[in-house]
Structure formats: C-alpha cells, structure tokens
Regions:
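Alpha-helical transmembrane segments of multi-pass membrane proteins
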Residues: 1-410
Length: 410
C-alpha cells in the first residue's frame, strides 16, 4: 500500500479495513465452528482464529508499519523506527499484564467485550491520525523518484538480494530459537506455570533495545558473550540433570537473549530508508512466520527429539559469520569476507572477529580430530561423564542424533 498508493488513497483503504474490522466485532467464535471430534486439530484451530480475529488481527498488524511510514512522511528527517520499539513495549505489557491482571479477574465474556471496546477506541484514534495527515503534502511521486535514483546509483542487484535475505533470515532465526528455547524449558526440563512467558518476554525486550537506537547494540560486546555462553550451553547439555534447574534456565535464557539481540541488532543495522519501510516489516513478518513454521510443523515431522534448538544455535552462528562479512559502514557493495568459510561451514570451525583479526578455519577431518582430542583431554583432566566412558561412547556406531548435533556444535 505504501509503495503503490499515494497517501490519500492509503488513508482511504486503511480506513475501510478498520470499519470492516469493527463490523466483525465481537470476536466470539461462531457456534458452527465448535469441534465435533472428527476434524484435524490444526485446521480447526486455524479456521476458528481466521473467523473470529482474522480481520481485526490483520488491521492491527498492518497499522504499525503503515503509521511509521506516515510518520516518516509527516516528519522528514526523524527516524520512525523507535515507534516499533514502543509497539513492542505495548506487547510486553500485555504479555505480563494479561495472566496476572486480566485473566484472574474477568470472565471470558467480559474480556471479549472490553477488547471490543478497546478496538473501537483504537479505530477512533487511527481516524484522528488519518485526519491529521490532511496537511501533509503529497510527496509520494518525488520520494519514489528519489528512491529509484538512489537504488540505481548505490545498490547493485546482489546487494539488494543479500540484504533482503538477511531481512528474512534474521527474524526467522530469532523466532526459531525463541520457540526452541521455550520447548527446551517447558517440555524437556520442567513444567512450571508461566515459565513460557520468560523466553517470550526476553524476545520482546531484544526488539525494544535494538530498535530504540543503534547505540544499544554493540557487536564487539554481544558476539563474544554469545560465544562464551555457547560453551555454557554445551556444558549444560552434556551434564543434563546434574546442573540445577535454575542454572539451566539461566544458561538457556541467556543464550536466547544474546542470540536474539544479535539477530535483531543486525536487523536494525540493515534497516532501509523510510520509502521501503513497509517492505522491510513485511519481510520481517514473513521471516518470523517461516521460523515458527519450521519449529511448529517441520521439525516435529523430521526429528524425534528437540533438535530445533540445536539447529537454531547453529543457524545463529552461521548468520553471525555471514553478517560479519558485510561492511556495516559502507553497504554500497556486498563484501563477503566470510565467503570461503561459508562454503565449508558444515565441516568447519570458524571464528571471525574484526577486532581480534582472527580467522580459524578447518576441514571436516580437522574438526573431527579436534573434537576427539578435546574430549579425550577433558576425560583425562576432569570427571566428564555422560553416561558411558567417552572413549567407548565414540565407538558406538548408532549414536543418537542429538549427540551428533552436540559434536557438531563443539
């Protein structure tokens, strides 16, 4: 809408959608959608959600990027991205407030009615905002020409595709590791009420910090911390129940926070000009959906255990390597410093740091030898037990897949 319609028509189209969303209220599901026991659960849930909150959710989710685009038109020179941080503050408050302040004190009918009233108020506020745009000059054509000229002069096709790929991959990886960590904590470790809220709250906090401003994300701090915490994750994985439950939660949640800070911090670094803001958020949403589909649908069909967490950690490492290959100060060309490492990533141990100027790359054979020697040395130096003697464990021909993933992470 922002790219293909002038400002006036954008207001009209979005206003029509807001009115249609009001017509669908209240969001109580229809009686015809009550399950009979013969339906596919996933399909039935999707039908209920689409029929009840489909249009209101569509309007709510599209308003945020559209309002940011309008803000950029009304206030040239001011960054609209801080509004995204504020929207995530609202999401965090709703996450923490609903189970403690709303659900215990209101019936479901009361919740639906109050939510409907809130939606009506929301539409009125959007209407006032649209009315205030009447004094904004229509600069869409000039902006489009400037943006097209800028793209032609400064951006190659390869660069645009690379950055578009990062817009998709970074949020996908963040969502995947969020869901993988949640599964790890709530299904593989302990069933604790409201424990699922902790990973989601940390996930939202990383969005808030990253999009509040570039000064809060420092590569040289977060990437080394994540590497150190990876060692803690591996240690907890090998030790298992020997580690206290609080320690496990701290390690896994710390890895989640740092991973999401890197993904979302790099995502903010690659933010476009306001003219492409809506495309940016659309790609972020698509990436988040892909990450969620991988964990929720694809991983259970492919794996017998919670391998999505291990794969998500691996993906974070891969993205860190690839993002470090981009020069953040001069994106006029894609400078893949890590391209040779990427070709052998699945069989290599690569550490790339701009400040320490260290690049360590090994072949698959060298990595396997390193793993064997390291495990042998650890067995000799400390009591490193995972159920069987390590030298015997490595001779087992039919290793569980999770152990292979752990070896790969090492």
């Amino acid at each position: 809408v922002n790219r293909f319609l002038p400002l006036r028509k954008q207001v009209i189209v979005h206003g029509v959608l807001l009115l249609l969303a009001i017509i669908t209220l209240p969001i109580t599901p229809s009686e015809s959608l009550k399950p009979t026991g013969n339906e596919l659960p996933t399909v039935q849930i999707l039908l209920v959600l689409t029929q009840s909150i489909g249009l209101p959710y569509l309007v709510l989710s599209t308003t945020s990027p559209l309002v940011q685009a309008w803000f950029a038109k009304a206030h040239p020179g001011r960054s609209p991205y801080r509004l995204y941080a504020l929207s995530n503050v609202g999401s965090l408050l709703a996450l923490l407030g609903f189970p403690f302040l709303v659900e215990p004190w209101m019936t479901r009918t009361a919740q639906i009615n109050w939510w409907s009233l809130g939606m009506v108020f929301y539409v009125l506020v959007c209407g006032y905002l649209a009315w205030s745009l009447r004094s904004v000059p229509n600069l869409d054509k000039d902006e489009a020409k400037k943006e097209k000229a800028r793209l032609g002069e400064n951006e190659s096709r390869l660069r645009r595709l690379a950055i578009l790929g990062f817009w998709l991959a970074l949020p996908a990886c963040g969502t995947a590791i969020l869901m993988g960590t949640t599964n790890k904590l709530c299904q593989d470790m302990a069933v604790v009420p409201f424990l699922w809220m902790l990973p989601l709250a940390l996930y939202l906090v990383t969005f808030i910090i990253s999009f509040h401003g570039s000064r809060w994300y420092i590569r040289e701090v977060y990437i080394p911390l994540l590497v150190l915490l990876w060692a803690g994750v591996l240690w907890v994985m090998f030790k298992g129940v020997v580690v206290h439950i609080i320690g496990q939660i701290l390690v896994f949640c710390g890895a989640l926070f740092l991973s999401c800070m890197i993904c979302h911090g790099e995502l903010y670094r690659l933010r476009p000009e306001p003219a492409r803001l809506t495309m940016y958020y659309l790609t972020i949403s698509a990436g988040g959906a892909l990450g969620g589909l991988f964990v929720a649908l694809l991983a259970p069909m492919l794996f017998h255990g919670y391998w999505e967490y291990h794969i998500s950690l691996w993906a974070v490492g891969l993205l860190v390597l690839m993002v470090q290959g981009l020069n953040p100060e001069d994106l006029t060309a894609v400078k893949w410093r890590g391209l040779s490492l990427l070709r052998s990533y699945s069989g290599s141990l690569a550490i790339c740091s701009r400040y320490f100027k260290i690049i360590i790359s090994s072949t698959l054979i060298a990595q396997v030898l390193t793993v064997l020697v390291s495990l042998w040395a650890m067995e000799k130096m400390v009591d490193f037990t995972i159920g069987v003697n390590i030298s015997e464990w490595l001779q087992i021909s039919d290793l569980p897949g999770e152990q292979w993933i752990r070896l790969l992470l090492i």
